[in-house]
Regions:
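Sec-dependent bacterial lipoprotein signal peptides
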Residues: 1-21
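Acidic, polar ligand-binding/catalytic clefts
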Residues: 95-160
Length: 276
């Protein structure tokens, strides 16, 4: 950080010479009252960050439209979650760094407790079970679950999966809903992420995918051979996740900046960009 210093100009040439001599000898001048605040008093000073000056965020990638690999982005990633986090980071005077992480290790809190990142931004639903291990930000997105099938599969609802194979992502609320609601003779298969789920249905390894509606919608838009046949209102809200009891100041700072993004319209602009 550069600190501007003001040197008084003396009335005589001799005094000017003395002033120049003092500067050249390295004697520090007192900072002026208009100098910027030091790092110790900056908004990010007490956030206990993994790396100073950086907001380190763990996310399970890909999970479009929330987390997307993007070589054109400074962080290497884009998507709704990532861009919201970038907005938060900028408001805190920080640089965003994104680490690709397994979702199950995020929702269990394992990666967060290990202090590998400051928080998780990964389309994570706030649940009472997860609250036992992690702290959440204020909700930032309302979501539905959905069922994606191949257009010519003949499957029109969850009941139509009797005797068939249903793909879900491990550790998700989609898996929980499938376990409770799918036909008893449906085979439910876990996958690490959407990066494996989507190729699996394309290859005919599974008959359907049950997961968050925005993600399945991305697939039906990308390939007209697939469609969402049902959505399920499970009253889910997403939150950003923090190590339990360890990042309270950061949690508050993120909540404050989310409110600021709503107030200045930047959140709404991102929402419109990704969800219309």
């Amino acid at each position: 950080m550069l600190v501007k210093k003001t040197l008084a100009v003396a009335a005589s040439i001799a005094a000017v010479a003395l002033t120049l001599t003092a500067c050249s000898s390295g004697t520090p001048a007192a900072p002026s009252s208009s100098a910027p605040a030091t790092a110790a008093s900056s908004p990010a000073a007490d956030l206990q960050l993994v790396a100073p000056g950086t907001l380190t965020v763990c996310a399970d990638v890909p999970y479009a439209p929330f987390e997307i690999e993007d070589s054109s982005s400074a962080s290497g990633y884009s998507g709704f979650d990532i861009e919201v986090m970038d907005g938060v980071a900028k408001k805190l005077g920080l640089t965003l760094k994104v680490i690709d992480s397994d979702f199950d290790s995020l929702q269990s809190g394992t990666v967060l407790v290990a202090n590998q990142c400051d928080l998780a931004a990964s389309a994570m639903t706030i649940t009472e079970e997860r609250k036992a291990n992690i702290d959440f930000s204020d909700p930032y997105y309302d979501s539905l679950q959905s069922l994606l099938v191949k257009m010519d599969s003949g499957i029109t609802n969850l009941a139509g999966l009797a005797g068939k194979t249903l793909g879900v992502q491990k550790g998700t609320t989609g898996k929980s809903y499938a376990t409770k609601s799918a036909p008893k003779d449906a085979k439910i298969v876990d996958f690490p992420s959407d990066g494996e789920l989507w190729p699996a249905i394309q290859a005919g390894q599974i008959d359907a995918i049950l997961q968050d509606q925005p993600v399945n919608h991305t697939h039906e838009v990308a390939d007209a051979k697939y469609k969402i046949v049902e959505t399920y209102n499970t009253n889910e809200q997403y939150g950003f996740a923090f190590a339990k009891g360890k990042k309270l100041e950061l949690q508050k700072a993120v909540n404050d900046q989310l409110k600021a993004m709503h107030a200045d319209g930047s959140y709404d602009a991102l929402y419109k960009k990704y969800f219309g």
